[in-house]
Amino acid sequence: VWSNGEPVTANDFVFAWQRLVDPEAGASYAYLAETIKNANEIMAGEMDPAELGVTAVSDTEIKIELTQPTPYFESLLAFSAFFPQNEAFVTEKGDKYGTSSENILANGPFTIENWDGTGLTWDLVKNEDYYAADEVQLEEVNVQVIKETSTVVNLFQQGSVDNAQVTGELVKQLATDPNVVVQKKARTAYIEFNHDNVYLQNAKLRAAIGLVINRDELVDSVIGDGSTAIGG
């Protein structure tokens, strides 16, 4: 159920995905949908978004047509780019959609409140219409964007904030602090090569550049947040 009381339907996903690949929307993650039928042609402006290979079979079921086997496709669906959007709400808000808490419609465990679009604070308020609202233990989360890591650490130590993410040199300084919790997650970072460069068109040269990167030194001395290098 949307936070305005309307039901979430399969059409909300179809609309959202068509909007994702619509070149007029300029979505930065549109490429993630490239294995869906006609997605590349739509992103190139050669076909209408309505021709995307996604259709609503019923109010609760969608049919997705892929152009090739995509083993990771199901994991993509958990990414925010594939979240549903309420067509009537998006159309009503127009260019203002997503620019403030009043212009955002939610269907998750929280709604966003008190955000003006540029401010560095907002509130996440429990969504009573969420299907599993009884399992949501927090009534409200107050979010602050604090750009200086040392500042947020000081606020945490003073008890003014409940959570602080630390990076770089502070990780080493706080390594023995009993309040520090290390959460290791699989994450991939990459370097993009400009294939317009005649030399970088050579796959062996690109592979060679990758081989000379000292990953251990990179994570220890540059990132410095406790990350562990992997091969590849």
Which residues are covered by each model-predicted region?
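Solvent-exposed coil/turn segments that connect beta secondary-structure elements
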Residues: 13, 18, 59-60, 67-71, ...
